[in-house]
From Swiss-Prot:
The protein's name in its UniProt record: Ribosomal RNA small subunit methyltransferase B
Localisation per UniProt entry: Cytoplasm
Group of enzyme by EC: transferase
Active-site residue list: 375
Pfam families hit by this protein: Methyltr_RsmB-F, NusB, RsmF-B_ferredox
Entry similarity comment: Belongs to the class I-like SAM-binding methyltransferase superfamily. RsmB/NOP family.
Single GO MF annotation: RNA binding
Amino acid sequence: MKKQRNLRSMAAQAIEQVVEQGQSLSNILPPLQQKVSDKDKALLQELCFGVLRTLSQSDWLINKLMARPMTGKQRTVHYLIMVGLYQLLYTRIPPHAALAETVEGAVAIKRPQLKGLINGVLRQFQRQQDELLAEFNASDARYLHPSWLLKRLQKAYPEQWQSIVEANNQRPPMWLRVNRTHHSRDSWLALLDEAGMKGFPHADYPDAVQLETPAPVHALPGFEEGWVTVQDASAQGCMTWLAPQNGEHILDLCAAPGGKTTHILEVAPEAQVLAVDIDEQRLSRVYDNLKRLGMKATVKQGDGRYPSQWCGEQQFDRILLDAPCSATGVIRRHPDIKWLRRDRDIPELAQLQSEILDAIWSHLKSGGTLVYATCSVLPEENSLQIKAFLQRTADAELCETGTPEQPGKQNLPGAEEGDGFFYAKLIKK
């Protein structure tokens, strides 16, 4: 039996690591969840995701409720108060229980002398809640985004930025990809129905299913046998543009964690696929996905800017470049992105993307297809990136996939329930 731990203090420490140390929640949370019971795993995730989704609100409230911010070794208490505020505002946890557990969290982080302070701040919020929230809802902090990102979204999407922000602040739906080598989508949906769950097919992407209610993967029919994979609908759209064929040599660049690698092999089981990623640790997830689905691909660690180091002079029929990006299209899935990214990251990422595009283009066969994809909504990484590439690359031709005013297709967050995503399909003359 696992030792009873204070979930509020664990959440506060995790959030502190994200905000103060720039660590990714997807790296921090799983090891913490291993330390708690199954029933507590979901609550720990809810507290971490929820506070990060609404961070600017709790920051704003604490500044109103406290004369001085908590600093130094007491900084964790700041995040513990955030966890308390989130419970009072957004969960069905009874207020007395939320307060008691949060105050007790001070003992777990070895700050028992601050229990009275935490209790006082949270009770003061309860007394002034209506007045404080009215003031908050009239401020820019209500958008729950950092100001630099808000400015970029307003500039790029003067008519749509508010709906993008709203979508980013929602909980995401759970999308699945049915493995067509095992079942048709309709036959798997029938199995899902037999298991007492409901799913809905995507109108455009033939393997995509949205669950009515998110569920643990082990509850999904045939998950362990590789019948289905968790993957957002927008990410599945890459295969529509790539259109892999049996017998082709296909490169999946920046491939981890392997969702698109395995999708290529579901669509074209006899394709020769090379999956490459710069992050050796994340490549372990590519191997795991291939193993679960019973598929084979060549997997290599490598930097996309220097392809000759990992593929020599090899030429490919098709290349999928899921480029490193700001991930501003998947904030609803990874709310820590709002606080991990900085404005200065965008030009640096755009430069890296252009270097990878230029380097990999020489490894595409004449007549071959390259699909450039990102999970960003920022034009500098997407339409402007492709415009610049077309201007400097004489043998590159764009396949029309989107609206006339931009090369490529930009999906915005929440459109057809999918993530924000960009695709451009290029043919080598």
